């Protein structure tokens, strides 16, 4: 059975670093207008998922709202909430313990749970939220 994976909202930004090996990783805005870089801390506020593989200075296509592949660092079950970890990879979000991380969406198709695989995640980076104690 097929699934519509068309994005609802994407942004064209500028890669402020070489992102050529980070397709399907989480990205954040930098302090420079219209620039993005890979998430490198769980407290980073992700803007979306990198959908292409640009070198530094090239156009980065970023998925903000929609259903996107997300590379994961560990198994993420279907219907689990997802965060972007300190390596820019998706991981399970536990709202009561991940109090400094942002939930970016819900896994709608699990990959099988091997690190570096792509799970399919319904992403809403316009409205990510932090966990609560």
Language model region names:
Residues 1-133:
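Surface-exposed, low-hydrophobicity beta-strand/loop segments enriched in small/polar/acidic residues
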């Amino acid at each position: 059975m097929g699934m519509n994976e068309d994005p609802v909202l994407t942004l064209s930004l500028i890669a402020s670093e070489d992102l050529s090996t980070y397709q399907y990783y989480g990205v954040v805005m930098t302090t420079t207008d219209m620039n993005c870089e890979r998430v490198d801390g769980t407290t980073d506020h992700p803007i979306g998922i990198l959908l292409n593989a640009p070198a530094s200075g090239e156009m980065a296509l970023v998925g903000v709202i929609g259903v996107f592949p997300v590379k994961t660092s560990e198994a993420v079950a279907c219907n689990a909430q997802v965060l972007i970890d300190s390596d820019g990879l998706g991981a399970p979000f536990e709202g009561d313990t991940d109090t400094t991380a942002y939930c970016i969406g819900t896994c709608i198709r699990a990959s099988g749970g091997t690190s570096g695989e792509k799970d399919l995640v319904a992403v809403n980076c316009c409205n990510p939220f932090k966990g609560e104690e």
